[in-house]
């Protein structure tokens, strides 16, 4: 399933250039030989300026980087990235420079530098972080060798599909913001990852396959008092607490394997509600910090003949009869690149996401000033 929170069940997308080429060829074939000299239809104006301003790339120097989150004061980001020196994602923090350019600051490695890592997040007090890591893998040397070989193969085939594996050696750790005082929080056999703090910092919601299927669990911030939140078939992951701490938003493919839908559930395990029900892949949901909106990534796969791009979508919601009720849906991005993993700054005025709208089509982090849709 998507790693995304970057967390993935299966292959989510091929490289952008290949997909664009395929869609172009389909269009030309449909035109037929008599349409060879026809002029292309005028391109519609982008919708992005309505919601996104001052778009800027804030990571560089990595083979790929993504899944970033803001610190509580909005001055630092934490994210995962692959350097040219190691085959797996590691966790980095990076200060944001003041002003419109935001960040070109030096990243700081805060994970161990070995193993696979993912799903980092700041504690609400800004003094600690959590992330998932497999650096305790007893066969780590062999795993690293396999990872290097895989990277070499991918370099020969730039159109490979990415697939997230549920590494059974993945555990959740906490640390100081500089990476010191590393502490293991989970000890179950199997995959433990996709973690986020509650607004008060007292609890952590995460995904685990300790019971068979990947489901959601909640534990105290020190790793104690673990309880299962969802009891569903398929994959259920990528959870985040709502700003008031009463709800958890997440993604699930319980209805159709590989077709993820956005769900919300009460922290008491009641009133599980699907906000989407379509033939697409909907994932990486995230709450707006001050207004009743949830943003996520979506691509429509209902028609296999049509290329579907991953874009960002925003839904307004309301609490009705003890449940989260879906409201108006607004598309936020329409760039030909892949746009995924959106998150808001603590004040809701900026949006950060992972995109391949780079010169070399690698995935990197972008930040933009954000405006909500007009009511």
Language model features: what each stretch is:
Residues 1-6:
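N-terminal secretory signal peptides that target proteins for export/translocation
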Residues 30-375:
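Sequence signature of WD/YWTD-type beta-propeller architectures
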Residues 20-33:
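Signal peptide processing junction and immediate N-terminal pro/mature segment
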Residues 10-22:
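Bacterial N-terminal signal peptides
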Residues 11-13, 28, 322:
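A periodicity- and composition-biased signal for non-globular, repetitive helical segments
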């Amino acid at each position: 399933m998507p790693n995304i929170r970057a967390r993935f069940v299966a292959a989510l997308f091929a490289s952008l250039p290949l997909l664009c080429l395929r869609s172009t060829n389909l269009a030309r074939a449909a035109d037929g030989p008599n349409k060879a000299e026809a002029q292309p239809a005028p391109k519609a104006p982008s919708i992005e300026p309505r919601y996104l301003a001052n778009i800027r790339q804030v990571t560089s120097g990595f083979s790929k980087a993504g899944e970033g989150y803001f610190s509580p004061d909005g001055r630092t980001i934490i994210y995962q990235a692959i350097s040219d020196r190691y085959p797996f994602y590691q966790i980095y923090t990076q200060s944001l420079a003041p002003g419109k350019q935001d960040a070109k600051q030096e990243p700081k490695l805060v994970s161990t530098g070995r193993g696979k890592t993912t799903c980092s997040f700041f504690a609400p007090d800004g003094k600690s972080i959590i992330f998932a890591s497999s650096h305790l893998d007893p066969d780590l040397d062999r795993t690293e060798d396999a990872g290097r070989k895989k990277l070499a193969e991918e370099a020969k085939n730039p159109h490979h599909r990415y697939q997230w594996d549920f590494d059974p050696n993945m555990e959740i750790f906490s640390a100081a913001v500089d990476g010191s005082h590393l502490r293991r929080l989970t000890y179950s056999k199997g995959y433990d990852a996709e973690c986020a703090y509650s607004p008060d910092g007292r609890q952590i919601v995460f995904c685990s396959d300790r019971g068979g299927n990947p489901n959601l669990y909640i534990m105290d911030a020190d790793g104690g008092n673990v309880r299962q939140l969802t009891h569903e078939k398929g994959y259920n992951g990528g959870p985040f607490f709502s700003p008031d701490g009463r709800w958890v938003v997440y993604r699930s493919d319980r209805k159709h394997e590989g077709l993820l839908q956005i769900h919300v559930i009460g922290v008491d395990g009641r009133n599980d509600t699907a906000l989407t029900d379509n033939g697409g892949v909907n994932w990486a949901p995230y709450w707006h910090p001050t207004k009743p909106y949830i943003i996520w990534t979506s691509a429509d796969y209902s028609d296999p003949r049509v290329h579907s791009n991953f874009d960002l979508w925003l839904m307004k919601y309301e609490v009705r009869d003890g449940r989260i009720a879906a409201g108006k849906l607004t598309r936020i991005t329409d760039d030909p690149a892949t746009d995924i993993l959106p998150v808001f700054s603590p004040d809701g005025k900026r949006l950060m996401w992972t995109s391949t709208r780079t010169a070399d089509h690698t995935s990197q982090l972008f930040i933009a000033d954000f405006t909500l849709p007009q009511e």
